[in-house]
Amino acid sequence: QRRALAELNSQLTEIRASAAGTAGAFAGAFATGHLISLADEWSSVNARLKQASQSSDEFSSSQKVLMDISQRTGTAFSDNAALFARSAASMREYGYSADDVLKVTEAISTGLKISGASTAEAGSVITQFSQALAQGVLRGEEFNSVNESGDRIVRALAAGMGVARKDLKAMADDGKLTADKVVPALISQLGVLRDEYAAMPETVSDGITKVENAFMALSL
């Protein structure tokens, strides 16, 4: 909890420095009703995360890594935890570990940020991608959602598979984007995605999201 408090203080300092002229958005992040909503969301998300974990140790470890990913990328912990929870069972069926699920989650989350996806678009991609993993293949509506809102994810997938981006649609239509190809391809590009995102300027919105995550982390 001390670590969470220190993280919160750090995030508060950063966002105060960058939030000049955006007092409305800053105040909204600390509205009592919103904080209560965050607490409820924390409980709900972690209930799903526990169900997706095979042990209490795995739950605790995954929870902390997901929070680290969220704070590093300025993305909502709830979105990242939801992707992990939805994908874990199906990925295990294909022989992947919890660490692999976390890496794919980070690749998707980082790719969405680089792509400039809105909250609604990111939510749609997370839902469709997790459904694709459950089916064992990325195609149809699932591929279209990622292709439309997560351009950087699609380019990373193409690079990881060693094919041209333009060829992915035909591969998706032919059912060739199977989980055993998609997962390692995305994981192989994680370092590139991290470096690319690290070079991007942080926005006020990113800062507010980090503060919201930090409030949630007080329960860690």
Predicted segments with their positions:
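Structural motif
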Residues: 15, 77, 116-123
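ATP-dependent adenylate-handling ligase core
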Residues: 96
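Small-residue helix-packing and pore-constriction motifs in hydrophobic alpha-helices
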Residues: 9, 20-73, 82-93, 103-114, ...
